Structures are given as C-alpha cells and as structure tokens.
Amino acid sequence: PFLFDQTGFDAAIYFGDAGWPGTEAHFLMHEYPVPVCSPTLPGVQPHMTPEAIAELPLLQQSTRPYAWRQWFAAAGVTTPRAMTGMRLELFSMLAQAAIERLGVALIPPFLIQQELANGSLISPCPQSMPSSRAYYLIVPEHKAERPALTCFREWLVGEATENA
C-alpha cells in the first residue's frame, strides 16, 4: 500500500496491478523479460532453445519467484530446474551476477540496454514473456490535478509510450 498521507511523496512508480484505493494509476508499460547472460558463460551458444536454457544455471529474482517457471511454461517446457538457482533481490544484482558468469537471468531489456549494447550481456534465446503485471505511475487522488504533477505525469507517460 501507498502511504502518501504519511509521507512527503507526491507519486510512486509501481510494478504490479492497478487499483489502489484513493489513488489514480496511470499505465506506463508492460514488462517483457528475456533470458540474458554473459557471452562467456560455459555452455551458452547463440540461438539457444528454451530446453537448452533449462540446462544452464538459472538466476532467480526473489520478488518474482515464479518468473522462470512462467517463462518455461510459455515456451511449452516443463523443467524441475525452473525454481532452482541463486536468488537475488534487484534486477541490477541479477544483471551483475549474469555478467560475472553465475548464470542466466530473466530481465526486461529496457533495464539493461547499455549491457546489451556493449556485449557484456547477450540474450541467447530471444523469447520474451509478457508479465501479467505492469508499471504504473500511482498518484493520490487529492494531488492528481496539481500542475507540476500533471506535467510530470504527461512527460513520464509520453516517455514510457515512446520507449515501449
């Protein structure tokens, strides 16, 4: 829950479902994570199948514990390994672990554009999986019409739409 009345915050960017009481939720973007790893991870090859990805060490994000299972299910693959592997809390931690050759992580490409561009991370299997949740700008109803917040909201929604 958002405690806007008890803090000085005017808004929050939230990944989840819309519909928090007393707030307006403005859709920003869906999340489409893809498998990423170091190009030098042992066993990795270009153009791998989901079945081949299942044989590599998997890196898990603790806040999305079923992500690999859902990704494999969307690819039609059943593997007991979908719930195994090192668990990390943040996408930045997953990205660094993947760069350090600790395994394959599921990360939305928009969060690792630089790493993909410079080759420190690759996507050996480009199959993405749309998340059932999305990113939203959450604004308390009583602050929604403030000019500065309206300007920020319009800019942020425009940027998210342009870069989605």
Residue ranges with predicted function:
Residues 23, 123-126:
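Short beta-strand/turn micro-motifs at beta-sheet edges
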Residues 40-41, 111, 143:
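Short, well-ordered alpha-helical scaffold segment located
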